[in-house]
Design a protein with these regions (language model features):
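Active-site-adjacent structural elements that line small-molecule/cofactor binding pockets in enzymes
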Residues: 1-254
């Protein structure tokens, strides 16, 4: 098992740039394998819906102070040398594929190949509405992003026909350090999301326990060996461990 930790780049935990840098350096020293960033453009005071899987709102004080994840990773890559960076998740459909390709390739270059690309759809419809993007097409937009990134990272010159846009045949001089580009990890627990993981990703970002037989059946249909898919549980709790530690400590103090 490998352990990662979330970067405190949002909410009250975001205190200063110096604290962020110290956090990254110390996490690397302690042996964490990956530092994780989230992605949120804004959080309306009147949301159109609650966070998936809950019946409570995500309060604005957590989301009204959210540093740009791409900028944060670039900053922290400069003060570290071994720890990797990933996103849980970067809401890929909200970005134009060309802008995202350049940004991720730049981060891969600046970090000497220590960046992974963790993508999700964003659960918040308000973000799509504000950017003028169709909520119903979010899955198709993610597929478009994935296809363009693959083209950008594996071909040169690059030419691409997207959904309602095109990229003219062009030489792309800045190439990724990692062969084939940063590894792609996808989030989601729905059937379309799991199907996309099996077809298009190196690994799966999950916070839910999907029955193994369901995963294996779906991925087998795509010819995917589950053993080759990396699993990242992006939300974990230490409650049971803390309770056990407290019981042991109590015994020692008696």
């Amino acid at each position: 098992m490998k352990l990662g930790i979330a970067i405190p780049h949002y909410g009250p935990a975001l205190s200063s740039a110096a604290d962020l840098r110290r956090f990254a350096v110390e996490a690397e020293r302690l042996g964490y394998v990956t530092l994780w960033c989230g992605d949120r453009l804004f959080l309306p005071t009147d949301l159109q819906g609650d966070y998936p899987g809950t019946d409570y709102p995500i309060y604005a004080e957590r989301g009204n102070r959210f540093a740009d994840p791409l900028t944060v990773v670039g900053t922290l890559a400069a003060v570290t040398s071994t720890v990797r960076f990933n996103f849980s998740t970067l809401n890929a459909p909200l970005y134009h594929p060309v802008i995202l390709a350049r940004a991720l390739t730049t981060l891969d270059f600046l970090s000497d190949g220590r960046v992974d690309a963790g993508f999700g759809l964003s659960w918040m419809r308000d973000e799509y509405d504000t950017l003028g993007l169709p909520w119903s097409q979010r899955g198709a937009r993610l597929d478009d992003v994935l296809s363009f990134l693959h083209a950008w990272w594996t071909t040169n010159p690059v030419e691409y026909e997207g959904q309602g846009w095109s990229f003219p045949r062009s030489q792309v001089g800045l190439r990724p350090v990692q062969p084939g580009g940063p590894p792609v990890y996808l989030a989601g627990v729905t059937e379309p999301a799991l199907d996309r993981v099996g077809r298009r990703a190196t690994g799966w970002l999950t916070f839910d326990a999907i029955p193994p037989e369901v995963r294996k059946t779906m991925w087998a249909e795509d010819g995917v060996d589950e053993a080759l898919v990396d699993f990242f549980f992006t939300h974990t709790t230490m409650d049971e461990f803390l309770e056990a530690a407290e019981r042991v400590a109590d015994l020692q103090l008696r």
